[in-house]
Amino acid sequence: MPADYTSTARALSLPMSPAESLSPAEEDTRPLWSHLASSRRNTASPSVRESTGLRDQVVNQATKMLRRTKKTWRRLTFWQRIGAIGAALLAILLGLSFMIFTGQVFFWLGPVAEKWEQSWLAFFVLWLCVFFVSFPPLVGWSTFGTISGFIYGIWKGWILYATATVLGSTCSFIVSRTILSKFVNRMMERDKRFAALALTLKYDGLKLLCMIRLCPLPYSVCNGAVSTFPTVHPLMYGLATALITPKLLVPAFIGSRIRILSEKNEEMSAASKAVNICSIILTIGIGVFTGWYIYRRTLARAKELEAKERADIRRSLQADHAAHRPHGSFSEDPDVNTAATTLARDEEERIGFNDFDDDNVDLVIDDDSGSEISPNLTKKQFPGPYRDEFTDNDSDVFGDGDGPDSQMFRLHTHVRSG
């Protein structure tokens, strides 16, 4: 019997080896369905795996958004829920009304377009309209661009649209920064994602700003949102807007094609109509695809720069922690330093540091409770690091004995002698 136990224990202690490949003879004896299952696993195409991964990402994002929406909805009071429903219905009605109005406006402009084309007053009024819709939360920027092309043609309409856009976005940036200054400071100190995005503009700010301006984002809202980034200056934002003005040729071109179709509808052949309609559809498709592509690239670049900034901050924290020195400022620019400090706090939590100069964790035991351990882990009660050497002013715990019975912590059990 002992021999059997020994052999069994030895067999159980052996590591589990992976399944060996079967010989051709053994492979023939396998069931047919086993061959089919293995062949399906081995022949899974990369496109199927990629589509499955993309589908999983979409499902995960939708699940997270739904969970976040439910969580926010539960926090709302009864009247807040009624207000949220009313605001959603109002937004839908305004959107539908705006779409209907946009479709009708070109029919109204048809009879007067030729007259307004020669009027500088109409030019100035339309320029002011484009200028003022740059301020959040006004809408209609794209519509006014199409109207500019409809009335003045592609090139003159583009000049009107581009100049009003550059000046309007710059003024909107300055006004929004002045009004939202307190909001900016609060976001910089509390929101690590906001601080990370602000720091990414420190590296290739102009390039990233141009990419943001090319993204299909709400125009006036984008002006107000970018103004909250303290690392972006008004002149830089105006320059980035000026560099992407060739994008504004798209709505101006669409407006000019719509006017040609409306004025020469009866004179044009079916082929000419098809060419103009296809050119409009193609231009819209190119604009949508370009905006989507640049939006994806912008997000990827922002994540890359954020990872780089976090890595630099992490190395700096670890170096100062190893040298037992407090960490200084990250930058001479106060706005950049505030954003970096916010990220540094987040990196401290990830690394496990409690403070810039906190090198040890002390366990505080409450003598009054006798057996309870205080959860407070602080360096203020034990400012000095641990050491084994004693000076004349320190007491030796082994020389003093166990002390009074009220301060003894018994970690053993008493065994009664039988």
Curated annotation (Swiss-Prot):
Coiled coil: none annotated. Residues 1-10 have a biased composition (Polar residues). It is a multi-pass membrane protein. GO terms for biological process: mitotic spindle elongation; vesicle-mediated transport. Residues 149-258 are annotated as: VTT domain. The chain crosses the membrane at residues 82-102, 120-140, 158-180, 235-255, 274-294. Residues 1-26, 367-388 are annotated as: Disordered. Keywords: Golgi apparatus, Membrane, Transmembrane, Transmembrane helix. Residues 1-81, 141-157, 256-273 are lumenal. GO terms for cellular component: Golgi membrane. It is found in: Golgi apparatus membrane. Pfam families: VTT_dom. Residues 103-119, 181-234, 295-418 are cytoplasmic. PANTHER family: GOLGI APPARATUS MEMBRANE PROTEIN TVP38, GOLGI APPARATUS MEMBRANE PROTEIN TVP38-RELATED. Golgi membrane protein involved in vesicular trafficking and spindle migration. Belongs to the TVP38/TMEM64 family. The VTT domain was previously called the SNARE-assoc domain. As there is no evidence that this domain associates with SNARE proteins, it was renamed as VMP1, TMEM41, and TVP38 (VTT) domain. This is Golgi apparatus membrane protein tvp38.
